[in-house]
């Protein structure tokens, strides 16, 4: 019985990752160009679903970088690159919604803020 449990655990952990391990993971476009890194993952406390990731883009050593909220369902993990793939170019990302230093963190949970974000990307909202 211990062998069965060990095998089950191995299968489950092959596709699971701790949220804190996602922070700092590379995000690339399908051509393999680096778009940025995941800064944090935002979870819906009530549903338990991942809402979106905040991605750091540009800058040097964190200075001058933009932070973009990216709907989680647009990111795909690619074991070949050891990171996430986002089907956007750098120029598309430059025109995307961003978070500035004055952003009210309470707005993360504001549906009036989230709906335009998902519309911008043409993504299905996680709450649907």
Where are the predicted features?
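Peripheral interaction segments used for macromolecular assembly
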Residues: 1-128
